[in-house]
Amino acid sequence: MSAGGEHLKDEGTRRQVVLAGGIAGLVSRFCVAPLDVVKIRLQLQIHSLSDPTSHQNIKGPVYKGTLPTIRSIVREEGITGLWKGNIPAELMYVCYGAIQFAAYRTTTQALSQLDPYRLPPPAESFVAGATAGGLATASTYPLDLLRTRFAAQGTERVYTSLYASVRDIAQNEGPKGFFRGCSAAVGQIVPYMGLFFATYESLRPVMSGLHDLPFGSGDAAAGVVASVLAKTGVFPLDLVRKRLQVQGPTRSKYVHRNIPEYQGVYNTMAMIVRTQGMRGLYRGLTVSLFKAAPASAVTMWTYEKSLHYLRELEVASE
């Protein structure tokens, strides 16, 4: 972490920020891939875990909790099942990280020039984070959709390769098929990244002096706290996004064969509440927090360290 808890907008050149963001996305995705697959499987599961009668006539596995789901995937699909969808996911995380941090830096720098009408620092961070998150999500959304569809595949493969999936969606669903659930994704990520960066920037100065933390840095701890608070608030929209991403001609071919037909964000939320109750909107929240906390910690720690290394490299080359 930069000395004194320096603001992210004041760190590095644009090129350094893009490279550090891409590296952070790459490392973060690899570390949390298994939890991401588990989260997606749980989010797509529609039957009640507390009502055994709802399991009747279910085609596909019945997952109960994070560890049992991991064991079930490994038993039925092998250890590689925990990394399904990793290629489009890695591409997405690299591009997302690069775009997000570059957009955040650019937006915060622009907002800082608004004197005498400048926003308070937390509001600046919220607006910049929301803008960066929305832009990065919209730009990389087709990869996000492909990641979800591959992770939702069971032992019977819906798509044989990344190329085959792109070709199939283009032929059978058209260009709009790559953006199913995009409105829910943007609606979720805008407040999420706004809250995340506002919380993170506020905690960085406080945690910069905590030298007893792992790796001697407070970046990871600040990322964990910010992520947990933000993720809990917007989780229902994340679940809706996943349900919408697997709509279309292949809806009944994924590991959960009984995924209902959903149309639109509002109608999807209403249908989930009507058939599964309010708890249905938070299915997979626990594993989502288990994933989001370390993912954010790894992302921010790797970003800060990569940026620090790139800055030192530039100084050494001068």
UniProtKB/Swiss-Prot annotation:
It is found in: Mitochondrion inner membrane. PROSITE patterns: SOLCAR. SUPFAM superfamilies: Mitochondrial carrier. InterPro entries: Mit_carrier, Mitochondrial_sb/sol_carrier, Mt_carrier_dom_sf. Keywords: Membrane, Mitochondrion, Mitochondrion inner membrane, Repeat, Transmembrane, Transmembrane helix, Transport. It comes from the Eukaryota. The keyword Transmembrane helix applies. The keyword Heme does not apply. Its main location: mitochondrion. It is a multi-pass membrane protein. Belongs to the mitochondrial carrier (TC 2.A.29) family. This is Mitochondrial thiamine pyrophosphate carrier 1.
